[in-house]
Design a protein with these regions (language model features):
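Beta-propeller-forming repeat regions
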Residues: 1-421
């Protein structure tokens, strides 16, 4: 991970946990990061253009209502319920100690920004509009997903204890893949036909200790390529069957973390252990990142022993390629373009603060130059007029694709919050 450099660091007044880091993605493509400490403090990280032409990080505390004194934040999550404007929901779960009775737990849902008055994202306004729901259990992860059809409730029975982490993915709006891990080490995946509301397959395995995270992914780092004639078909990368397959990475607090390959077709039969992941205390988090910018994702895991470990898939196995030491235990990871420069940053939440790590800009420039040379080798460079025609053609094609996608999604395709307990 030598090509990932520390750019900024922000101290927290108190520690967070594995659930207190989330991204906010606006409809214009701008990303922001919302994170919190346990002691009622929530912060927003964003980047602003400065007069000197440089991007400046800005951290501001957001004062959310209905978080009483003495309460602690357990988890948070954010999603946009609209595809054409910034109409966000922010969910925060809290626990309030009560010496006379059982601890009180709540799910606070913040929304109702007046888009007619102020169509731009205003976190401060959203933070003042709260629906507080009294819970009769202690929540863990807060997660949002989509309901594609009104009565789609087919899932295998889960007679286990507390969920630690939950992840859902969809294939072509007709198949739902669900993975979850529990405090007891139980880990389960299921594949559901959402059209017929039937369970196609379900698989279970057991880990020693708690499962700290499950994450579904493809090997290929997908990018929507523009349909420009200046890029010939021979340069367009065609995804292989292995790259299209859905895999799941499972991190464990006591034993080797593992990746199960092609779970839709193979279930949990193809297991690749992440060798060395059990040597650095408990693994608390993971994320998927194209660290070397080769178009394929690598797995980064964070440990309580303050280590970042990066694994790459080569020769049908996941190999430890590099590691990096930080000063405090690592609790959560995000890989998101928060600076708006087209390159994603690695966001690392530790016990003491938030790291923003960036790709080495010199290496990025060299990589871009080499790829442009490969693309335009022995090919005619486009004229300005041709570029304009191609841009208009691409925009028309995107409009047609958007209309097609909207037609394939039913009227019940709205995100909802899901809490793990």
């Amino acid at each position: 991970m030598d090509n990932i450099l520390d750019a900024h660091y922000f101290l927290l007044p108190s520690q967070g946990n594995i659930y207190t880091l989330s991204k906010i993605t606006q409809t214009n493509g701008v990303n922001k990061v919302l994170f919190s400490s346990l002691k009622r403090k929530l912060f927003l990280l964003e980047y602003h253009d400065h007069l000197d032409g440089c991007l400046k990080p800005v951290i501001k505390e957001i004062l959310f209502t209905y978080i009483p004194n003495g309460a602690e934040i357990i988890s948070l999550d954010v999603f946009n319920k609209s595809t054409v404007c910034d109409d966000f929901f922010i969910g925060i779960t809290i626990i309030k100690p009560n010496p006379d009775h059982n601890n009180e737990t709540y799910l606070n849902i913040y929304s109702e920004q007046d888009l007619d008055v102020n169509p731009e994202l205003n976190i401060e306004s959203i933070a003042q509009n709260c629906l507080s729901i009294d819970l009769n259990f202690v929540p863990y992860q807060l997660y949002h997903t989509q309901i594609l059809r009104q009565f789609d409730d087919a899932e295998p029975r889960r007679e286990t204890n507390s969920f630690i982490y939950y992840n859902i993915d969809y294939q072509f709006y007709s198949r739902r893949i669900t993975a979850f891990g529990c405090e007891c080490g139980h880990m389960q995946i299921s594949v559901v036909d959402t059209v017929q509301s039937t369970i196609l397959s379900s698989h279970v395995t057991q880990f020693e200790g708690s499962v700290s995270r499950v994450q579904l992914f493809n090997l290929c780092n997908y990018v929507n390529l523009p349909a420009l004639d200046l890029i010939s078909d021979k340069h367009r990368k065609q995804e292989t069957k292995d790259e299209m397959a859905i895999n799941v990475v499972v991190t464990s607090t006591l034993q080797l973390s593992a990746v199960f390959m092609d779970i839709v077709n193979q279930g949990l039969n193809v297991r690749c252990n992440l060798e060395g992941s059990d040597k650095y205390d408990s693994v608390l988090c993971s994320c998927l990142a194209d660290v070397d910018m080769d178009g394929e994702v690598e797995i980064i895991i964070g440990t309580y022993a303050q280590e970042l470990l990066m694994y790459k898939y080569e020769a049908d196995k996941w190999e430890l390629k590099s590691r990096r030491s930080l000063e405090l235990p690592i609790q959560s990871l995000l890989y998101v373009d928060v600076t708006g420069d087209g390159m994603r940053e690695l966001i690392v939440l530790t016990l003491g603060g938030l790291h923003v790590m960036q790709h080495n800009q010199d290496l990025v420039y060299d990589k871009l130059q080499n790829r442009l040379k490969q693309l335009f080798k022995n090919e005619e460079l486009p004229t300005v007029e041709k570029e304009k025609d191609l841009i208009e053609k691409t925009e028309d094609e995107r409009t047609d694709e958007s209309e097609t996608d909207d037609a394939n999604v039913s009227e019940y395709n709205h995100p909802i919050f899901v809490t793990g307990n």
